[in-house]
From Swiss-Prot:
Protein's recorded name: Diaminopimelate epimerase
GO BP term (any one): lysine biosynthetic process via diaminopimelate
Site (Important for dimerization): 268
HAMAP family reported for this sequence: DAP_epimerase
A GO CC annotation given for this chain: cytosol
Database matches in Pfam families: DAP_epimerase
Reactions this protein catalyses: (2S,6S)-2,6-diaminopimelate = meso-2,6-diaminopimelate
Residue sites binding substrate per the record: 11, 44, 64, 74-75, 157, 190, 208-209, 218-219
Enzyme's top EC category: isomerase
Length: 274
């Protein structure tokens, strides 16, 4: 099976063409491929499939390193767009794809940058999903470690975002797994730790569902900015600094789609026997 290794700000992916190859992946196979010592190694595996809808260009599937399938990955979406272009699967500048939970438009800006229409943030608790009687800008979550105030949103996948004073001191690996698996998130959640530098600039670390802390999380950056705007601490155009680099996030507010712009880097092509 042919594949490419790619990354978006250090969030790394194994990308597989399922259009010209017959690909069958089980959770066990994905976990073996994800092993950084005995396999390829990656945060997520991205699978390009033919479109389910004839009006779209491709179907986009995402698998975490633990083998679980998820509905969204923003950094992966940028790499997906770069991959299908590099492999000659399309020559379009605007690439229309479906995911497990909706549709996206991926726009190639230049040799490195890709702009992604991530759709509208979803706030209704039942659709996140998150257990709550109604939408609130802030929720209180209790864990064995501490009680936190957080915002909750879905960008096609669930995000819990809490503000911290100093991003370097944030208890990402201690509090992250407790919140990821909190009983109020029936499908678990991605946990964002956000330091607000000013109204147009944040620093962010993300403990990703099924992957742990990564160098960057595109949908996490989108979720953090959306929460910050809803809470009134951020403006509509925000630079997000992650351990692996920076993203630019734009959102005009409720009723509008959110846009993410950032790099997508091809590392190498490979072949592996399954």
């Amino acid at each position: 099976m042919q594949f490419s290794k790619m990354h978006g700000l250090g969030n790394d992916f194994m990308v597989i063409d399922g259009v010209t190859q017959n690909v069958y992946l089980t959770e066990d196979v994905i976990r073996k491929l994800a092993d950084r010592h005995r396999g390829v190694g990656f945060d997520q595996l991205l699978l390009v499939e033919p479109p389910y809808d004839p009006e779209l260009d491709f179907h986009y599937r995402i698998f975490n390193a633990d083998g679980s399938e998820v509905a969204q990955c923003g950094n992966g979406a940028r790499c997906f767009a770069r991959f299908v272009t590099l492999k000659g699967l399309t020559n379009k500048q605007d690439i229309h794809v479906s995911t497990a939970k909706g549709k996206m438009v991926l726009t190639l800006k230049d040799e490195e940058k890709v702009r992604v229409n991530m759709g509208e943030p979803i706030w209704e608790p039942a659709q996140v999903p998150f257990t709550a009687n109604k939408f609130e800008k802030n929720y209180i979550l209790r864990t064995d470690l501490q009680t936190v105030l957080c915002g909750v949103v879905s960008m096609g996948n669930p995000h819990c975002v809490l503000q911290v004073e100093d991003i370097n001191l944030a208890p990402v690996n201690e509090l992250g797994p407790l919140l990821e698996n909190h009983e109020r998130f029936p499908e678990r959640a991605n946990i964002g730790f956000m330091q607000v530098v000013n109204r147009n600039h944040i620093k962010l670390r993300v403990f990703e569902r099924g992957a742990g802390e990564t160098q960057a999380c595109g949908s996490g950056a989108c979720g953090a900015v959306a929460v910050g705007i809803m809470q009134g601490v951020l403006d509509n155009n925000v630079q997000v600094d992650l351990p692996g680099g920076s993203l630019q996030i734009e959102w005009e507010g409720v009723g509008h789609p959110l846009y993410m712009t950032g790099d997508a880097t091809h590392i190498y092509d490979g072949f592996i026997k399954l």
